[in-house]
Amino acid sequence: MHGVVVVELKGYREWTESLGPRREHIIQQVQSRIQAAVWRSFTAVGALPHHFRYDFYIALVNGVSLDLVKRAVEKAARASPVGAGFCLGVGETPYEAYLRCGGGGGGAASPAVVAHMDVINSTEATRRNGPLDVYLKVVKLLGQLGERCKDLGCMAFYLGGDNIALFLPSPNAIYSILDGVDLRVRVGVGVAKRPYNAFVRATWALDRLRSAGREGVEVVK
């Protein structure tokens, strides 16, 4: 079983509106500070977080106790101008766990499976066409992956540059996810007891593919 936590910043929209129309520079700085705190506190306990809209955050928490999750949320909330709450979901896949957030259930004892994907030759494409062209292609790819993940039980997130992270239900799921993707990509897949360690292994696998100039998938367990 996989475990997913969704963190909500309570009253965040109301806080932003209270700042008046000349507010965006403040909001962007605060969001950056909160995101840094979320990454710091969740990875410290072995979880793997990401943002939703910046007033919601998600984390894969396989193998991470509820007490450690609470501690991570409390630490991250110190960077927020409003309070934070969270729900925990458990399911056969990360996406199912997300849909069941707040529904209770047992522990998430399955190994965490995480993918780190990049687009091949994006650096050369950026030199040729500028960064906007590659950015739009990656955003389109993210949308395609997000729709496929609804059926396959995964979740996809934009990391920046040409990089995408995926919470996977199993290592083999990546092959079904990539079926039909029209961009050339390389993907490292990591498997570990805790999600952040799985992501580290995925990144290590991706770096191996890059160094060898190969595309495709490499799995590290």
UniProtKB/Swiss-Prot annotation:
Disulfide topology: none
Keyword annotations: GTP-binding, Hydrolase, Nucleotide-binding
Record GO biological process: biosynthetic process
A Pfam family per the record: GCH_III
First-tier enzyme category under EC: hydrolase
Catalytic activity: GTP + 3 H2O = 2-amino-5-formylamino-6-(5-phospho-D-ribosylamino)pyrimidin-4(3H)-one + 2 phosphate + 2 H(+)
Statement: the UniProt record of this protein carries the keyword Lipoprotein: no
Gene3D superfamilies according to UniProt: 3.30.70.270, Nucleotide cyclase (3.30.70.1230)
Family in the record: Belongs to the archaeal-type GTP cyclohydrolase family.
Function: Catalyzes the formation of 2-amino-5-formylamino-6-ribofuranosylamino-4(3H)-pyrimidinone ribonucleotide monophosphate and inorganic phosphate from GTP. Also has an independent pyrophosphate phosphohydrolase activity.
Protein name: GTP cyclohydrolase III
Phylogenetic placement of the source organism: Archaea, Thermoproteota, Thermoprotei, Thermoproteales, Thermoproteaceae
GN (gene name): gch3
